[in-house]
C-alpha cells in the first residue's frame, strides 16, 4: 500500500526558493485585496456624497410667491419678490444666495447686502414678512421680501419692460422668475410684476 522511496534521487523536495515564491504570491494577493477593498469604500463614499449634493440641488429651492414693483415718476424703481421654501427644503440662507438680473439694458449678478434699499447698487436686501428671521427661510410658513433697487442695477424699468430674475441658493438650486412691467404705469404707486 505505501511505497518507500529509498533512493535519494527520486524523492520530491521543496527548496527554500519555492517557499519564498509561495510567500511572495500570498503577500501580493493580500495587498491586491486590500487595494480593492479600499477602492470600493472610496467609490461608495464618493457616490453617496454626489447623491446627497444632487438631492440638495433639487429639493433645497425657493418658491417665488409674488412680485411687485414700486412706481416713481411712471417708472419702477424697486423690484420686490416674496419668497418661501419649496416643499421638503432645508433652511435656506438668502445672504448666501445670488440673483442673476437680466434686464432690458444690462445683465449682472446681485449679491446680498444688509444696506438700506436706497443704497443697494448691484445688491439685494431682505426683510421678514412672516417668520423669525429676515434672511433665513426656516419653515414653510416663513415669508421673506427680497428687495432690488432697479436704478442701482441699470435704469428704472419703464412700461412694458421685462427682467429675468434667477435666484440661486447656497445649495446651487435655481428658481427663475420673469418680472413683466405692465404697459401703463400712469397714476400708480405699485404694480404687480
UniProtKB/Swiss-Prot annotation:
A single Gene Ontology CC term: archaeal-type flagellum
Signal peptide: none
Propeptide span(s): 1-12
Pfam families: Arch_flagellin
Alphabetical list of InterPro entries matching this protein: Flagellin/pilin_N_arc (IPR013373), Flagellin_arc (IPR002774)
GO biological process: archaeal or bacterial-type flagellum-dependent cell motility
Compartmental location: Archaeal flagellum
Keywords of this entry: Archaeal flagellum, Glycoprotein
Record PTM: Glycosylated.
Top-level lineage group: Archaea
GO molecular function annotations of the record: structural molecule activity
The family this protein is said to belong to: Belongs to the archaeal flagellin family.
NCBIfam families, per the entry: arch_flag_Nterm
Function according to Swiss-Prot or TrEMBL: Flagellin is the subunit protein which polymerizes to form the filaments of archaeal flagella.
Protein's UniProt name: Flagellin B1
Organism: Halobacterium salinarum (strain ATCC 700922 / JCM 11081 / NRC-1)
Amino acid at each position: 500500500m505505501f511505497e518507500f522511496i529509498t533512493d535519494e534521487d527520486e524523492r520530491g523536495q521543496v527548496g527554500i526558493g519555492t517557499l519564498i515564491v509561495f510567500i511572495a504570491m500570498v503577500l501580493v494577493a493580500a495587498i491586491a485585496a486590500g487595494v480593492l477593498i479600499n477602492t470600493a469604500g472610496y467609490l461608495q463614499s464618493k457616490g453617496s456624497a454626489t447623491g446627497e449634493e444632487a438631492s440638495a440641488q433639487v429639493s433645497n429651492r425657493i418658491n417665488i410667491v409674488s412680485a411687485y414693483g414700486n412706481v416713481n415718476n411712471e417708472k419702477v424703481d424697486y423690484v420686490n419678490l416674496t419668497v418661501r421654501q419649496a416643499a421638503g427644503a432645508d433652511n435656506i440662507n438668502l445672504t448666501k444666495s445670488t440673483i442673476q438680473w437680466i434686464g432690458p439694458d444690462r445683465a449682472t449678478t446681485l449679491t446680498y447686502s444688509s444696506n438700506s434699499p436706497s443704497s443697494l447698487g448691484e445688491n439685494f436686501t431682505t426683510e421678514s414678512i412672516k417668520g423669525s428671521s429676515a434672511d433665513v427661510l426656516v419653515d414653510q410658513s416663513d415669508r421673506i421680501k427680497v428687495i432690488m433697487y432697479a436704478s442701482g442695477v441699470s435704469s428704472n424699468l419703464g412700461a412694458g419692460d421685462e427682467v429675468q430674475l434667477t435666484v440661486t441658493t447656497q445649495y446651487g438650486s435655481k428658481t427663475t422668475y420673469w418680472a413683466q412691467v405692465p404697459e401703463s404705469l400712469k397714476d400708480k404707486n405699485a404694480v404687480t410684476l
